[in-house]
Amino acid sequence: VARGANSFLEAMPQNQHLSLLWVGDSQDFRTRYFEKHFQIGLNIRELEIYFCENGVKVPHSFCFDDRTPAFAEAWYLVELLHRDLDQSKFSTSLPFDSPFMLMGDTQDHNASLYNHELEALHACLLKSVRLFQRIPSLLTPIKSLLHQPNKIALEPETFTLEYTAFSSVTTGQKIIVGFSAGDHLRPKPFYFIKDINQNFRPKNRGLDYRP
């Protein structure tokens, strides 16, 4: 999904063009709109991606079980062709390093082997979404300071769910409340708060370990 977004959306500071926004009505994550009315959606529970047109999921989705990354790339190209979108724009490159991502046509995604893990991950994300949705009401006394509109986004680079609780156009400062399912330093799920500004650099993330 991040590759599709990176192929068709203009780059934004801190790779915000890659953010997958939570859509409450459909209970899924979607890219920002590109080429006026297209999005790419993600259903984590089923490990399924699909195109959306004018906010509506369309048929011919792609499920990752027993399919290679090369198969996924071919699916993208076919779907782009069906929508008269420029296939030459699609690229597998990303603006960040991802050394453990599957590539090529030699290894299948075995989503069904991780059914319990996907179910647990989906449940954790849903619970966190509900918690983040309560933040505006909890911070009513300082509502004028809150970032509007309030977006909940899944960040592909860190695979963290993030909510911008405060944003300053003047200074570029942002205070973000987030949830992580775990990483190589902290294997268990955890919540975090990070403070970033315009000088934020991807290799100096707020979640980096500092002994």
Identify the function of each model-found stretch:
Residues V1-Q39:
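N-terminal ordered "arm"
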Residues L20, R32-I44, T170-H184:
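Broad, structure-driven detector of short, well-ordered beta-strand segments within folded domains
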Residues R30-R67:
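Cofactor- and metal-binding active-site motifs of prokaryotic enzymes
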Residues T31-Y33, V58-D66, K89, V177, ...:
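Short amphipathic beta-strand/extended segments with alternating polar/hydrophobic composition
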Residues P59-N115:
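Long, hydrophobic, well-ordered secondary-structure blocks that form the structural core
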Residues V78-K89, S128-I142, F200:
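Secondary-structure boundary elements
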Residues M103-D183, F190:
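Aromatic/basic-lined ligand-recognition segments
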Residues P189-P211:
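A hydrophobic, small-residue-rich beta->alpha segment in the mid-to-C-terminal subdomain
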